[in-house]
Curated annotation (Swiss-Prot):
Its main location: secreted. Binds to WNT proteins and inhibits their activities. May be involved in mesoderm segmentation. Residues 354-379 are annotated as: Disordered. GO terms for cellular component: cell surface; extracellular region. The keyword Cell cycle does not apply. Keywords: Developmental protein, Disulfide bond, EGF-like domain, Glycoprotein, Repeat, Secreted, Signal, Wnt signaling pathway. Residues 1-28 form the signal peptide. Residues 364-373 have a biased composition (Basic and acidic residues). This is Wnt inhibitory factor 1. GO terms for biological process: negative regulation of Wnt signaling pathway; positive regulation of fat cell differentiation; signal transduction; Wnt signaling pathway. It is found in: Secreted. Interacts with MYOC.
């Protein structure tokens, strides 16, 4: 650790401020190489007292002499001035030693004047081995002039759980606050804090809390006027103006998404989805899904879905007449036209000079005695 100066006599008022924030007491013991350090760096000292010099508070786990008699100092300590909104302390656990801290209390006793004190570190954790800044904030609300009392209680322990440093119990400190004025004022219940910035209530934002916050946001040019309430432009409605109020009718399953505008399903176009992209209509229940491209329903195929499909097929002696219905050539029968009539039966049943027709009753009756009929197929 670099050598730091003793507390300068010219800054007696800073002594009181230091005690206001962190009037620590230390356990007696010999200095240790691996130990705890706490100080105010030169930059923060310049802000507070006008000159740059590190101010040592804790060295090698022991308090600087000026911090010992807190009770006597508390009787004459002044309130933290209006222009000081926060104070930075730097701390470090030197070497390999581990130190744990906990902020037991950060509490304002005058919440109409000042909110609870703040720190920029977790309320419970370890003191870092690298020099790090702990900022204690005094958030005046700016609602009124006055002096706010507050409480800061922190404890530091070693790795064995023994208390090394702790603020005195029931120590009360004071901060001077004043009413602030924000240029343009704060609207919708917002108030001007000590930094002359509007702090807005839930549901509003903006420099003057003039903008309402809608979740989800207003769409299609809608205006959020109060939290969760949108005023929609002509042609739109809904909680967040997400729905179009269409006078235009969208045909063929189209959806109106903007006044006068339709989103068309695949295969359709036009202002009202009235134009098919297929010059020739798709047959047998097929749907146009692109330019001259049909999506066929089950049992049909082809560019226009005009060809029926038979599974597994009608073979070399039949043609597919309807989905899964084969029309067999003369002399053939069966589900897939793969069975042939006997020649003697054909000649016996066919009159002289006549041709066998596919649906000849006498032939069909003769075959029904030999082969059971197969339904849903044409012989």
């Amino acid at each position: 650790m670099a050598r730091r100066s003793a507390f300068p006599a010219a800054a007696l008022w800073l002594w009181s401020i230091l005690l206001c924030l962190l009037a620590l007491r230390a356990e007696a013991g010999p200095p240790q190489e691996e130990s705890l350090y706490l100080w105010i760096d030169a930059h923060q000292a310049r802000v507070l007292i006008g000159f740059e010099e590190d101010i040592l508070i804790v060295s090698e786990g022991k308090m600087a002499p000026f911090t010992h008699d807190f009770r006597k100092a508390q009787q004459r300590m002044p309130a933290i001035p209006v222009n000081i909104h926060s104070m930075n302390f730097t701390w470090q656990a030197a070497g390999q030693a581990e130190y744990f801290y906990e902020f037991l209390s950060l509490r304002s006793l005058d919440k109409g004047i000042m909110a609870d004190p703040t720190v920029n570190v977790p309320l419970l954790g370890t003191v870092p081995h690298k020099a790090s800044v702990v900022q204690v904030g005094f958030p005046c609300l700016g609602k009124q002039d006055g002096v706010a009392a507050f409480e800061v209680d922190v404890i530091v322990m070693n790795s064995e759980g023994n208390t090394i440093l702790q603020t005195p119990q029931n120590a009360i400190f004071f901060k001077t606050c004043q009413q602030a004025e924000c240029p343009g004022g704060c609207r919708n219940g917002g108030f001007c804090n000590e930094r002359r910035i509007c702090e807005c209530p839930d549901g509003f934002h903006g420099p003057h809390c003039e903008k309402a916050l809608c979740t989800p946001r207003c769409m299609n040019g809608g205006l959020c006027v109060t939290p969760g309430f949108c005023i929609c432009p002509p042609g739109f409605y809904g909680v967040n103006c997400d729905k179009a109020n269409c006078s235009t009718t969208c045909f063929n399953g189209g959806t109106c998404f903007y006044p006068g505008k339709c989103i068309c399903p695949p295969g359709l176009e036009g202002e009202q989805c009235e134009i098919s992209k297929c010059p020739q209509p798709c047959r047998n229940g097929g749907k146009c899904i692109g330019k001259s491209k049909c999506k066929c329903s089950k049992g049909y195929q082809g560019d226009l879905c005009s060809k029926p499909v038979c599974e597994p097929g009608c073979g070399a002696h039949g043609t597919c007449h309807e989905p899964n219905k084969c029309q067999c050539q003369e002399g053939w029968h069966g589900r897939h036209c793969n069975k042939r009539y006997e020649a003697s039966l054909i000649h016996a049943l066919r009159p002289a000079g006549a041709q066998l027709r596919q649906h000849t009753p006498s032939l069909k009756k003769a075959e029904e005695r030999r082969d059971p009929p197969e339904s849903n197929y044409i012989w």
